[in-house]
């Protein structure tokens, strides 16, 4: 009944399937981009990330690169094959049926971002969280060596 209780975009579409008066009130990604553009440096709203321990990266750089390549293929597949991806999502039990997944996917903003663009986006997100409550990011914004940019 309350969209604030939704855990993800798929939940909005599940609720819409049951109650056609439920609607998407705003697009957080779009609002974030407007707010950051107004401050002179437009960035995306990062809602997920991949993390690797430095020790693992140093010991297995080729495995990390291979994983990232496969991850990019997955992102490209989901964005380029909505119907097939929707069926796979439903088959995995993430949402009750493929129709809900197909309706949700175009609004999920699933992206693959690496390098300096990723670091810039993550830093902007950390800065906002830090300004709101430094404890939310462990008391400090991560240093530049926190980000794996592939360099």
PLM regions: where:
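Conserved C-terminal helix/tail region of periplasmic/extracytoplasmic solute-binding proteins
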Residues: 123-151
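Generic secondary-structure boundary/loop-capping signal
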Residues: 29, 54, 102, 107-109, ...
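Secondary-structure end/capping motifs
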Residues: 57-132
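Short, well-ordered junction/capping motifs at the entry into regular secondary structure
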Residues: 2-3
């Amino acid at each position: 009944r309350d969209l604030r209780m939704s855990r993800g975009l798929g939940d909005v579409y599940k609720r819409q399937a049951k109650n056609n008066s439920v609607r998407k009130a705003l697009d957080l990604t779009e609002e974030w981009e407007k707010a950051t553009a107004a401050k002179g440096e437009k960035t995306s709203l990062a809602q997920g990330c991949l993390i690797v321990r430095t020790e693992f990266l140093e010991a297995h750089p080729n495995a990390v690169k291979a994983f990232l390549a496969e991850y990019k293929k997955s992102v490209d597949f989901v964005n380029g094959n909505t119907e097939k991806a929707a069926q796979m999502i439903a088959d995995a039990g993430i949402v009750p049926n493929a129709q809900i997944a197909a309706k949700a996917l175009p609004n999920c903003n699933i992206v693959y971002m690496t390098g300096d663009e990723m670091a810039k986006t993550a830093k902007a997100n950390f800065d906002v969280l830090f300004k709101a409550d430094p404890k939310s990011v462990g008391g400090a914004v991560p240093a530049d060596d926190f980000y794996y940019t592939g360099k």
